[in-house]
Amino acid sequence: LSSIEGAAVTAVRVEGVLHEFSPIPGAMEDTTDLILNLKRVPLKMHVDHPKTLLLRTSEPGEVRAKHITPDPDIEILDPEAYIATLGAGSTLAVEMRVKPGRGYVSADKNFDEDLSIGWIPLDSVHSPVKKVNYFVDQARVGQATDYEKLTLVVWRNGAVSPRDAVGLAAKLM
């Protein structure tokens, strides 16, 4: 189930920030916290090539995923996902590179030569399935009691239904 294709933020560029350990002018979070929050935003892509999303806001207060400029090819599954808190008189401008993929991809592999200076490559988890648990119970069919029933509990980010996740995983096998 961890090998199902999904989408993730693979690189970011924050206006006024030189590297991932820099503070963000006017924001409560530093760049590392902002990156962690962006990686938690659940996404679903309708294309199979990288896309760039833009977040630009000057509204003081909490910045949420709903502030990201909409793209017809990328669906933001939780518009209320928290990103940062912005102070009065500040502007937050973030570009995000979103790619489809499978499983975990390290920041080294997410580095693209075509990205200009200022982009920070990120490690990414593309799988829409977050966690799986299973139970095996005794089952009865007619008079026979020597059957077992498998119950799967699938936690996901909303990009795929539990039924589709299990179906896609079965196809991969």
Indicate residue ranges for each PLM-predicted region.
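Protein-protein interaction/assembly regions in multi-subunit complexes
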Residues: 1-173
